[in-house]
A protein has these predicted regions:
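Thiamine diphosphate
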Residues: 1-48, 57-74, 78-104, 111, ...
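Conserved G/P- and acidic residue-centered "switch" motifs that form tight phosphate/ATP-binding loops
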Residues: 130
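Conserved glycine-bearing catalytic or ligand-binding loops at nucleotide- and phosphate-handling centers
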Residues: 196-213
Length: 373
């Protein structure tokens, strides 16, 4: 009984004092949430909790809309539009925003348990039968199924759609759950489309766009965060494969943003304008792969400095941009890449994690000021 502390201490003490000539196997059985009914009765909740009502077990979560909830709501619309849409989770229906989908479309929802490798290959099987599978999974857990992603999906060029939650920093969940590497390990794969929205609206539009990708795998990465302003009733806007979006026109310096650091980029741009009297260009690249090469070619005409911003380790979006410039441009330009530091960052407030990794507006300005001077 793993809940009998006194017995466990006695056992450990016994074997500690005993002269052993080999390994000892202890089969210790525990039950999630034992002694607290709301936790015992909930298969997929209470693994990690915020403050909650002790009597009911209801967690006091923020009412602000999250990227995860945008995914859940948009998938319902896509499922209504296309009966081939299916969803897959590895024991995380509520954590990935699929709980409402599970209730409304039980025959098109699949929880495979804590078996990420099976989830990926299972989705590949669905894709071969002309279904449109969406695999909703945390970035850190997708790492467990990388072999299946490569061999069962990418090499076969199967149109599985990966919804990669918890990409980037995750605050209190710490280094074990940080989605630090997905851009790096997906952008190097042939036959893959990789997207990262800068807002809730962009995420909704990317989800709708992904429905039309029927010849290769795709991935949308998004953070554990709230979306800010969001109009749920707004119609879908068209997204074109591999095309970025000009947010602000300027000269000399071009910010190439990928993902939800766009507001930090805007703040850094304001600092440059106020302190150096220079209006910079800001691009929401949208795609880590394929990148908007035509846009980059056009920007070279009146920009000398290119700044990439991403919430990922080295080797991701920035590498795609660097490779393009190294192989395609004859003009002498400067490139500075902002990405996660080459270290594991422990539990902390997410704003502090940005500062530790050098992706705060102030640090961005500090680094860029070298070029301005």
């Amino acid at each position: 009984d793993g809940h009998n502390l006194n017995l466990l201490i006695q056992l450990f003490q016994k074997y500690k004092e005993k002269e052993l000539h080999g390994p000892v196997f202890l089969h210790i059985i525990t039950e999630k949430g034992k002694g607290y009914a709301p936790a015992e009765n909930s298969n997929d909740k209470f693994h990690g909790v915020s403050s909650f009502d002790i009597q009911t077990g209801v967690q006091n979560k923020s009412k602000d809309k999250t990227y995860t909830s945008v995914v859940g709501e948009t998938l319902l619309k896509l499922a209504k539009k296309d009966k081939r849409v299916t969803t897959i989770t590895a024991a995380m229906p509520s954590g990935t925003g699929l709980d409402k989908f599970q209730k409304l479309y039980p025959d098109r929802f699949f929880d495979v348990g804590i078996a990420e490798q099976h989830a990926v290959t299972f989705a590949g099987g669905m894709a071969t039968e002309n279904l449109k599978p969406y695999v909703a999974i945390y970035s850190t857990f997708l790492q467990r199924a990388y072999d299946q992603v490569v061999h069962d999906i990418a090499i076969q060029s199967l149109p599985v759609r990966f919804l990669i939650d918890r990409s980037g920093f995750v605050g209190a969940d710490g280094a074990t759950h940080a989605g630090s590497f997905d851009l790096t390990y997906l952008c190097c794969l042939p036959n893959f489309i990789v997207m990262a929205p800068s807002s809730g609206e962009e995420l909704k539009n990317m989800l709708n766009f992904s429905l039309s990708i029927n010849n290769k795998p795709s991935a949308i990465r998004y953070p554990r965060d709230t979306v800010g302003e969001y109009n749920e009733k707004k119609s879908f806007e068209k997204i074109t494969l591999g095309k970025g979006k000009i947010i602000q026109k300027g000269k000399k310096i071009a910010f190439l943003n990928l993902g939800t650091r766009l507001n930090q980029v805007k703040e850094a741009s304001k600092l440059i304008k106020s302190k150096n009297k220079l209006q910079t260009t800001i691009i929401d690249m949208r795609f880590a792969k394929p990148i908007d090469t035509q846009l980059l070619k056009n920007l070279q005409k009146n920009h000398d400095i290119f700044i990439t911003i991403e919430e990922n380790a080295v080797g991701g979006f920035s590498s795609q941009v660097n490779n393009f410039f190294l192989n395609q441009t004859k003009k002498q330009i400067k490139i500075h890449n902002f990405f996660m530091k080459d270290e594991f960052i422990d539990q902390s407030d997410i704003i502090d994690q940005y500062k530790q990794s050098g992706i705060s507006p102030e640090n961005i300005y500090k680094k860029i000021s070298v070029y301005l001077n």
